[in-house]
Amino acid sequence: MGKKGIRYCILMCGCIVMLLILNLIMGSVSIPFSATLHVIFPFLHDEVTSNLLTIHPSWEYIIMESRLPQALTALLTGAALSACGLLLQTAFRNPLAGPGIFGISSGAGLGVALVMLLLGGSVTTAAFSVSGFLAILLAAFVGAMLITLLLFFFSSMVRSSILLLIIGIMVGYVANSIISILNFYATEEGVKSYLVWGMGNFGGVSMAQMPLFASIVLLGLLAALLMMKPLNALLLGEQYAENLGINVQRTRNFLLIITGLLMAITTAFCGPIAFIGLAVPHIARLLLNTDNHLSLLPATMLTGAAVALLCNLLCILPGELGILPLNAVTPLLGAPIIIYVIMKNK
């Protein structure tokens, strides 16, 4: 990684820390920074802050059970989705390839739609029952992984990356068609529940679930970082990569597994999140002005984490008026970037 890449990553780390703090102190209930710091780091004893927390005992619960897990989820999910987008754009040499294009998000949505229909709409929009929540989580994960395995199967039969991309798009269309049919026959409550899930939300991971969620995401990100050199070779074309000794099909399959795992876990917990995986790699590429994955991949992960935290912050800005749907905010940031990329490559 060059000096420019290091400076960029340091800058992004600073932005992440600042946005993380803002996510913890802002919301429908305003909590002082000193109180937030005291809750997260109890050893930083301060008598005045301790008295404040005694007067407002709910602050600790709000921070530890709502804002902190939500901020950490946004950070990890943003990094994961952005990494998935960059992996797919490089592997298929298509600037508009993204996690949603290959139908993995649609697979997760299909799993959730099946569960909500089979439960007869018993999964309420206000709060899931324990069994309902676990069913939705498992259904989203299984649906996403099944689509990934299906793409893995086609990948063993099709050598062309372009053809595999087209197959992925078609699989996504089929999944979305089945979802539409299921919604047509579902109860009103079931349709409403599915729509709420489909809006996306970083608040789906509790502190108790965070170790599992973080472990899987970090494992996927580490696996992605190990692919930086093969990704650089793929940039120059499949034939050139093969001449360098890269097994293109095996590399492509490994990238699909990484993408499927990260998309499955993030979509299962957070719902389908639009544009972050598609737009953030272009943001990092434009700011760094490089295609070298030794710099670009870590920078994309950090940029994705910062963008997701920013989106989460924008969602909670209305305060007491409510929380904006995540997928109502992400296109506002992502769509202009995609339009710019299309116009640049016209």
Name each model feature, range by range:
Residues 1-346:
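Alpha-helical transmembrane segments in inner-membrane proteins
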